[in-house]
């Protein structure tokens, strides 16, 4: 899952779209192509999904305002995969089936959650339907690792790869926080709590392997996702173990941050750490009065650390000016949608300027090299991964003006925001 990151200036983004995707203006419009979106957008999950949706909408607006690509304009075909406020794999599959049933939808942005991607990829792969996730971080979606309980080739069922992502993976994100906890926070003994999901278990595993390699010790417990509301027995066990911190592998809609709200009452008030699943406004809200000293990673670079970021962030905030319209993966979604539209433009050009097939779009997307996006230049490999390996670390703090923050801020306590602390670049380490 990543936070707002910057691009080269907005006008350059439009120029690159023209150069890589075909003509952006002139001639008569040939019709409208739909970009599917599947994200969790209701209930507790909305704090992650809606800002991500806005990133896609902003990318579509940017391309359309520049005249479209190869005579085509674009529109968003949006689907919510949340059920009762939490992401739902079956709903995600239904959404993808609906997209595939609409011949105007040539690819999709999403899903947000790795468990949903695991369920959707087999359906989309059979239709040669491009998926680009702005936030999936479970490595097993693309990498056949010894620790994986499933295999990427099985998800694709013998079909060519149709799945791509613009973030790095938990086999980098987990170790980054392990290093930060051990070296920066001086935590040598830690509690590890997992929500038992594809994402939560995977990132907790990656964290604890690295933490142990550094010389730390840990105690691990798992809980059953969104059905868990009382964490006091877990916290008491961790306290008795002597843990100096708590790392949670999970997401806010699976109650990962409810545990934070119960730590003081159990006398276990230590630093709270996790992955991008807790880098949300909902997490800060769920933590209640114990909303400071929450440490989270994000699977990409921060906007404040990327040259030229300010221009695109300012432009985005003018288009989407709500206090919670900028989320952890807004700009990744912008990049993902721009990459997809450019691939569609190239496919149309190669098809004589005509509407391309989904397979032609898949081929164009698979051939994407040197795509200049908001957080850097992307080159996708045969599995759909990119070569940007940056992980950022954030901590919740009280800020003077949330409107100027590039971090995610709380809803109930709007001056509590995630503030950037450090980044790890695993491509150069």
Regions found by a protein language model. Name each.
Residues 316-330, 341-408:
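Segments of small-molecule ligand-sensing domains
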Residues 48-69, 205-210:
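Short, polar/charged alpha-helical segment
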Residues 105-222, 271-296:
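Extracytoplasmic ligand/sensor domains, especially the bilobed periplasmic-binding protein
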Residues 29, 33-57, 79-89, 112-113, ...:
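Extracytoplasmic "Venus flytrap"
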Residues 1-34, 65, 100, 420-429:
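Short, low-complexity disordered leader/linker segments with a strong preference
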Residues 21-24, 28-30, 47-51, 66-151, ...:
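Beta-alpha junction/loop-to-helix N-cap segments that form part of ligand/metal-binding clefts
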Residues 24-37, 65-73, 182-188, 355:
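Immediate post-signal peptide segment of exported/extracytoplasmic ligand-binding proteins
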Residues 260-334, 346-351, 416-427:
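Extracellular/periplasmic periplasmic-binding protein-like sensory domains
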């Amino acid at each position: 899952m990543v936070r707002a990151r910057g691009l080269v200036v907005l006008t350059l983004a439009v120029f690159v779209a023209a150069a890589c995707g075909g003509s952006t203006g002139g001639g008569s419009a040939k019709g409208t192509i739909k970009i599917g979106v599947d994200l969790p957008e209701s209930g507790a999950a909305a704090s992650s999904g809606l800002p991500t949706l806005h990133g896609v909408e902003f990318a579509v607006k940017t391309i359309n305002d520049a005249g479209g690509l190869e005579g085509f304009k674009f529109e968003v075909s949006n689907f919510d995969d949340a059920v009762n406020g939490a992401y739902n794999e079956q709903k995600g599959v239904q959404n993808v089936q609906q997209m595939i049933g609409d011949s105007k939808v040539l690819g999709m942005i999403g899903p947000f959650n790795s468990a949903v991607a695991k369920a959707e990829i087999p359906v989309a792969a059979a239709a040669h339907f491009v998926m680009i996730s702005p936030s999936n971080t479970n490595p097993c979606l693309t990498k056949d690792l010894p620790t994986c309980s499933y295999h990427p080739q099985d998800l694709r069922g013998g079909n060519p790869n149709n799945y791509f992502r613009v973030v790095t993976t938990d086999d980098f994100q987990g170790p980054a926080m392990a290093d930060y906890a051990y070296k920066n926070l001086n935590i040598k003994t830690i509690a590890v709590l997992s929500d038992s999901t594809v994402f939560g278990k995977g990132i907790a595993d990656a964290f604890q392997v690295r933490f142990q390699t550094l010389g730390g010790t840990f105690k691990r417990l798992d809980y059953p996702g969104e059905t868990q509301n009382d964490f006091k027995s877990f916290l008491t066990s961790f306290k008795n173990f002597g843990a100096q911190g708590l790392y949670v592998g999970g997401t806010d809609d699976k109650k990962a941050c409810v545990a934070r709200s119960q730590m003081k009452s159990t006398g276990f008030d230590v630093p709270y750490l996790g992955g991008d699943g807790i880098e949300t406004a909902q997490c800060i809200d769920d933590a209640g009065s114990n909303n400071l000293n929450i440490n989270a990673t994000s699977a990409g670079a921060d906007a404040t650390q990327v040259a030229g970021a300010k221009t695109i962030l300012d432009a985005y905030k003018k288009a989407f000016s709500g206090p919670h319209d900028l989320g952890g993966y807004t700009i990744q979604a912008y990049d993902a949608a721009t990459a997809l539209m450019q691939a569609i433009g190239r496919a149309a050009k190669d098809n004589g300027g005509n509407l391309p097939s989904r397979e032609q779009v898949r081929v164009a997307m698979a051939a994407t090299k040197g795509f200049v996006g908001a957080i850097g230049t992307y080159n996708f490999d045969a599995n759909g991964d990119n070569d940007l390996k940056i992980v950022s670390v954030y901590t919740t703090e009280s800020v003077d003006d949330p409107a100027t923050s590039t971090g995610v801020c709380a809803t109930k306590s709007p001056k509590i925001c995630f503030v950037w602390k450090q980044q790890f670049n695993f491509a150069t380490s």
